[in-house]
């Protein structure tokens, strides 16, 4: 019976694509995972149990969703492509613990949806095979949301995975690195070759596991802290001082406030943002806040 064959089986994947006249859509960054070993390793990395509520982002034709449904209590899958939603209604028919929501996860009040679907105070695990072009904004939104999550296991481009734990002063170090450092610990779970997909992407992939961390220095407004960080990286080759002038203004009064803030935080204005660690950015934010400059 065809229905007993895993969706990720290469033959069945191709049959589904043929049946619905599907092609991977570049605008949605679609590549279909056809390596069952990788899928099993993703579920294992997420430590999915029969008591777990799972959020999946970008289910595609349901290859990963199927494996999650076999292990989890309930799976809530967000799919932006209406054509894929139609396919999922068929491929996931055997699983009554899966609900597919046709929406862009970046435009959803995830905390509200989780409360409605899983109940108040539910802890969730988030699993995703993310389109590479949108990996960073989705990760940042998830980490900065107020949802309770036990872990996040995400497939991403290997180059992006390397940025998560990039060292201070390196080319890969930036806003994403600092966001991860503030909220989570990132570990490389699986390396995934391009041959694991249909069609094969032009880059290798990696599965990364994020586990929540308590910040070493808690600030009262995380959004403003990362506003400072983002502004500091607005032009990587410019000095911190020049980026701050562009962000806060160039009038004499503002320059004086910036000078006081930098001195208070003990930061050289000529330094580039990539040379500052999270603690230094935190101190800079607090100093700018004291000068009423945080936006």
Curated annotation (Swiss-Prot):
Binding-site list for S-adenosyl-L-methionine: 31, 33, 58, 79, 104, 129
PROSITE patterns: RRNA_A_DIMETH (PS01131), SAM_RNA_A_N6_MT (PS51689)
Principal cellular location given in the protein's record: cytoplasm
SMART domains per record: rADc
GO MF annotation: an example: RNA binding
A cellular component annotation (GO) from this entry: cytosol
Keywords: Cytoplasm, Methyltransferase, RNA-binding, rRNA processing, S-adenosyl-L-methionine, Transferase
Entry's EC annotation: 2.1.1.182
InterPro entries for this protein: KsgA/Erm, rRNA_Ade_diMease-like_C, rRNA_Ade_Mease_Trfase_CS, rRNA_Ade_methylase_Trfase_N, rRNA_adenine_dimethylase, SAM-dependent_MTases_sf
Name of the protein: Ribosomal RNA small subunit methyltransferase A
Annotated source species: Leuconostoc mesenteroides subsp. mesenteroides (strain ATCC 8293 / DSM 20343 / BCRC 11652 / CCM 1803 / JCM 6124 / NCDO 523 / NBRC 100496 / NCIMB 8023 / NCTC 12954 / NRRL B-1118 / 37Y)
Lineage: Bacteria, Bacillati, Bacillota, Bacilli, Lactobacillales
């Amino acid at each position: 019976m065809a229905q007993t064959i895993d969706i990720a089986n290469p033959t069945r994947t191709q049959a589904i694509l043929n049946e619905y006249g599907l092609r991977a859509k570049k605008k949605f960054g679609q590549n279909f995972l056809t390596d069952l070993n990788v899928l099993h390793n993703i579920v294992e990395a997420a430590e999915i149990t029969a008591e777990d509520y799972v959020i999946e982002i970008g289910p595609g034709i349901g290859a990963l969703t199927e494996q999650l449904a076999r292990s989890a209590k309930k799976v809530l899958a967000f799919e932006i492509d209406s054509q894929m939603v139609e396919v999922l209604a068929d491929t996931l028919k055997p699983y009554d613990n899966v609900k597919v929501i046709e929406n862009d996860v970046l435009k959803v009040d995830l905390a509200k949806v989780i409360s409605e679907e899983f109940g108040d105070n539910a802890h969730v695990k988030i699993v995703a095979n993310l389109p590479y072009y949108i990996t960073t904004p989705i990760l940042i939104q998830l980490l900065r949301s107020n949802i309770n999550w036990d872990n996040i296991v995400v497939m991403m481009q290997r180059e992006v995975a390397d940025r998560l734990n990039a060292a201070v002063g390196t080319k890969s170090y930036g806003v994403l690195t600092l966001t991860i450092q503030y909220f989570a610990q990132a570990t490389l779970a699986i390396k995934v070759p391009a041959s694991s997909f249909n069609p094969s992407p032009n880059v290798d992939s990696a599965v990364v596991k994020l586990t929540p961390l308590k910040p070493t220095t808690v600030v009262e407004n995380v959004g403003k802290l990362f506003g400072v960080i983002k502004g500091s990286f607005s032009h990587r080759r410019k000095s911190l001082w020049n980026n701050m002038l562009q962000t806060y203004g160039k009038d004499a009064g503002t320059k004086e406030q910036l000078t006081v803030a930098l001195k208070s935080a003990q930061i050289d204005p000529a330094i580039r943002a990539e040379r500052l660690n999270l603690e230094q950015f935190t101190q800079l934010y607090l100093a700018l806040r004291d000068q009423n400059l945080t936006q």
